[in-house]
Amino acid sequence: MMKHLLSIFFIGALLLGNIKTSEGSLSSALETTPGSLLSDLWLDRFPDPFKILERIPLGLERDTSVALSPARVDWKETAEGHEIMLDIPGLKKDEVKIEVEENGVLRVSGERKREEEKKGDQWHRVERSYGKFWRQFKLPDNVDMESVKAKLENGVLTINLTKLSPEKVKGPRVVNIAAEEDQTAKISSSESKEL
């Protein structure tokens, strides 16, 4: 059943992309840029498997009473650094935690708690999301991990990270491989020292 629905969806998308209107192709409606209709529909139904690690921590205990809701994120790189913006409306700064790990991972977590229900209250609609959220990002090597600054304003958490100068960026460490005779020579020389 799911295969048939996906086939119909893709055939329809291909047909729509080839139909011309007075303004050009309808393929602009099929764009997958963030915020486009197709992108939102696609991401709601089929999340990017490579982004799952950014949203759900491996060690997170599952609490069935509280849903995990992701915070929407924008991340831009400028000449001076990186700026990460998360939408977290209704949260105070003491309800949000920002962690930076030595391995270059930035983690933002928090919880939006549901309002306490009072006796006699009758809810007509509950649409706002509640629960824990968690986002984690693998930062590039050019980020100064000591430069992390954050501010929370109008429901948007903005995290600024400064770039390191090119000469301070640590590249991968090259490991020398010893030949077998080098190992034998080291062993025999260490044995002779012990005698």
Curated annotation (Swiss-Prot):
Its main location: endoplasmic reticulum. GO terms for cellular component: endoplasmic reticulum. This is 22.0 kDa heat shock protein. It comes from the Eukaryota. Induction: By heat shock. Pfam families: HSP20 (PF00011). SUPFAM superfamilies: HSP20-like chaperones. Residues 62-180 form the sHSP domain. InterPro entries: A-crystallin/Hsp20_dom (IPR002068), CS_dom (IPR007052), HSP20-like_chaperone (IPR008978), Small_HSP (IPR031107). May form oligomeric structures. Glycans are attached at residue 160. Belongs to the small heat shock protein (HSP20) family. Keywords: Endoplasmic reticulum, Glycoprotein, Signal, Stress response. Residues 1-21 form the signal peptide. GO terms for biological process: cellular response to hypoxia; response to heat. PROSITE patterns: SHSP (PS01031). It is found in: Endoplasmic reticulum.
